[in-house]
């Protein structure tokens, strides 16, 4: 922590491939710190973080981060079209893959309601879409990356109950 104390103590967590888990705790209980240890946004000062049985420090940093997609509460959309924003997940994704990811993230319905659909412009920071729409687009972008590990860090806080079913 900022005061020199450990943010996490006595955490022992094993997640199997294909498993979905939720980590629940009070505000300030280091949930975000825990998930940010996986792609090494922070390094553990004690103990170890293993992915696939290998310490994350032993992975090539770029390879590790390419295998992880994180959708945060405050994600960023860039000025450009919806397609431009989705391509940040996978620059080589086909239109079909992008539409499938948006359907999975429950973004396709609202995209289809826009006059230019997937070619609709997004203002810098996504100021012309709602918070829930922005988060769904960010989830779709993360899904396009086809990550080995997908982390949703409070990323559904602005979406409605339909999206909570994700």
Regions found by a protein language model. Name each.
Residues 1-166:
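ABC-type nucleotide-binding domain
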């Amino acid at each position: 922590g900022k005061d020199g104390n450990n943010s996490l103590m006595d955490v022992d967590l094993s997640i199997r491939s294909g498993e979905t888990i939720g980590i629940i705790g009070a505000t300030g209980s280091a949930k975000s710190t825990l998930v940010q240890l996986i792609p090494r946004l922070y390094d553990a000062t004690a103990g170890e973080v293993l992915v696939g049985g290998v310490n994350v420090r032993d992975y090539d940093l770029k390879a590790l981060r390419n295998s992880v997609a994180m959708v945060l509460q405050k994600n960023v959309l860039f000025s450009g079209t919806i397609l431009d924003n989705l391509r940040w997940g996978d620059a080589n994704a086909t239109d079909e893959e992008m539409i499938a990811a948006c359907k999975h993230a429950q973004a396709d319905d609202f995209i289809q309601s826009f006059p230019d659909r997937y070619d609709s412009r997004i203002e810098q920071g996504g100021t012309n879409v709602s918070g829930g729409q922005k988060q769904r687009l960010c989830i779709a972008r993360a899904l396009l990356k086809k990550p080995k590990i997908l982390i949703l860090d409070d990323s559904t806080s602005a979406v409605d109950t339909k999206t909570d079913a994700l």
